[in-house]
């Protein structure tokens, strides 16, 4: 058979999280394709916020679209699969990612960039009554509601509490005030910090400067105060912030922007972490305990070079992460990455000005610094705008020669003489996995089906009924075989319903992209799992089918239904 344009999948690279590092790495995979590698991005949202622009968005300077990266478009450009789901665990023994709403996802190499969340669990009432700064989507949802309420009735007294005196809390307070001032509201903003100055990890000059700005703008600062409880007080949206000192402050909305923490599910994976639960990595951004795992951004702590959890490091780690993922996939020596010790921070003050600080050096607010920050942020985001619908990506269409080409050439490809069929062992393994996780619905009128497979399926047609049949077949509509199969099932069954019949059984025809057995198995498993989810809901039996390999994922069903004579 002709093979020169075929790029079979040899390895599965799975990326968990759509953080800055992964966004940059995906863009670089699109621009520097690696044939034979299938990339899958698993993320809970299809848009990921850029932290550098988020305060400006809250202040009203940027639209939602301008400060978010479209991961669907980016994944399409990189020809990567995109799974929208929440990760709940990782099986590092069997190299599988456990998701909340879909089958496990197998990997050969894994990278994690899921950011962090504010540590609020230990404070009574915080989880129930406070609004955490992350996930950002939830924060923005509450913020939009608050802006709408204040704009509708600006004279109604509103008290906002912000817990956290670090950079995040400071920028949030200034940005909220900058936006809400346009309504001339009856507004108080309280900021609580456990240290004696704002942004305690920065130089004292910056903390003192910020304190003066807060006083000038009327933001009430409670420094040296550790919040120990959030309690409801009478009416809805009325709470008491209780501090260890005994101080109490009444607030209507409480935003939690404290020290970052890692998700709890990481604890059960067995991966080595630091004391706060973040993944410990070496200078190559590779897990200390599991070499098949890489991590970057807030979720990672570089053991030899620990740094603050700041977006600047996530951005800087994007390129070295890409380089080491690429080298690992090719079996090459990894390259060390040493993060910088000092970095320039440009802090927006919510009014079209910004502060610049690095080390012991600080410049007061100016519009020139804001324009500089705005230029830097827009330049970064422009890298992810106006992307073509599909690039060369990991599939390597029209790719340049690479070190793994010989491996692809040596892969045994199925021949046309055997119909390019998927191997029996692969099919048996997939069906066995599916029966364990999602048993096939077997109707009483099915005499021979998947429970007792033979050369053909056998069905009964009850007296007084007629058989209604239809067939449909589609190439992949989206880059997620699990969802694609569900869409296909619904479309195929709709023709039976349109004839006034009840669907009873289906035969499947699947074309799986070329690859080694493990990658073919993973695709087929995701595809059939999605199909069976919809078939079982419709009480329709999968009774057989045919599976071949080809250059593009495709799926179809021959559907059987019954109707009255």
Identify the meaning behind each predicted range.
Residues 312-340:
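Internal hydrophobic alpha-helix adjacent to the cofactor/substrate pocket in enzyme cavities
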Residues 128-156, 248-315, 323:
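FAD-site-proximal beta/loop scaffold in flavoenzymes
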């Amino acid at each position: 058979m002709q093979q020169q344009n075929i790029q079979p999948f040899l390895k599965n690279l799975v990326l968990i999280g759509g953080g800055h590092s992964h966004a940059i790495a995906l863009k670089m995979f699109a621009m520097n394709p690696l044939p034979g590698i299938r990339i899958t991005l698993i993320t809970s949202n299809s848009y990921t916020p850029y932290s550098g622009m988020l305060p400006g968005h809250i202040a009203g300077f940027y639209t939602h679209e301008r400060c978010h990266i479209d991961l669907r478009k980016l994944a399409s450009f990189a020809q990567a699969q995109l799974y929208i789901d929440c990760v709940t665990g990782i099986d590092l023994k069997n190299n599988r990612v456990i998701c909340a709403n879909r089958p496990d996802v197998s990997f050969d190499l894994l990278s994690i960039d899921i950011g962090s969340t504010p540590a609020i669990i230990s404070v009574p009432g915080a989880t129930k009554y406070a609004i955490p700064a992350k996930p950002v989507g939830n924060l923005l949802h509450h913020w939009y509601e608050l802006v709408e309420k204040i704009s509708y009735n600006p004279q109604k007294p509103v008290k906002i509490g912000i817990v956290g005196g670090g950079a995040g809390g400071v920028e949030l307070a200034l940005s909220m005030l900058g936006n809400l001032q346009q309504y001339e509201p009856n507004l108080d903003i309280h900021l609580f910090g456990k240290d004696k100055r704002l942004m305690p990890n920065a130089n004292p000059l910056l903390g003192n400067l910020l304190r003066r700005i807060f006083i000038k703008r009327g933001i009430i600062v409670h420094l040296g105060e550790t919040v120990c409880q959030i309690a409801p007080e009478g009416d809805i949206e009325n709470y008491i912030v209780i501090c260890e000192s005994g101080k109490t402050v009444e607030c209507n909305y409480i935003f939690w922007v404290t020290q970052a923490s890692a998700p709890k599910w990481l604890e059960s994976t067995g991966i080595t972490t630091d004391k706060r639960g973040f993944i410990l990595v070496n200078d190559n951004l590779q897990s200390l305990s599991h070499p098949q795992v890489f991590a970057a951004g807030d979720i990672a702590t570089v053991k030899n070079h620990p740094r603050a959890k700041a977006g600047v490091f996530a951005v800087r780690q994007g390129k070295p992460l890409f380089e080491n993922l690429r080298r690992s996939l090719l079996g090459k020596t990894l390259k060390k990455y040493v993060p910088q010790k000092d970095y320039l921070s440009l802090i927006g003050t919510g009014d079209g000005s910004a502060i610049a600080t690095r080390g012991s050096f600080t410049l007061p607010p100016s519009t020139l610094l804001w324009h500089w920050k705005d230029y830097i942020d827009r330049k970064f985001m422009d890298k992810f705008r106006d992307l073509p619908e599909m690039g060369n990506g990991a599939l390597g269409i029209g790719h340049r020669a690479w070190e793994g080409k010989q491996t692809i050439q040596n892969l045994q490809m199925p021949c046309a003489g055997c119909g390019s069929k998927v191997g029996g062992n692969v099919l048996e393994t997939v069906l066995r996995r599916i029966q364990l996780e999602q048993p096939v619905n077997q109707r009483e009128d099915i005499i021979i089906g998947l429970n007792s497979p033979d050369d053909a399926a056998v069905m009964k047609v009850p007296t007084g009924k007629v058989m209604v049949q239809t067939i449909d077949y589609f190439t992949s509509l989206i880059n997620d075989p699990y969802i694609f199969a569900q869409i296909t099932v619904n479309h195929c069954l709709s023709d039976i319903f349109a004839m006034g019949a009840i669907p009873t059984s289906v035969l499947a025809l699947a074309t799986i992209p070329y690859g080694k057995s493990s990658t073919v198995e993973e695709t087929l498993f995701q595809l059939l799992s999605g199909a069976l989810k919809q078939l079982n809901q419709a009480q329709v039996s999968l009774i057989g089918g045919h599976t071949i390999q080809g250059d593009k994922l495709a799926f179809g069903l021959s559907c059987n239904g019954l109707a009255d004579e």
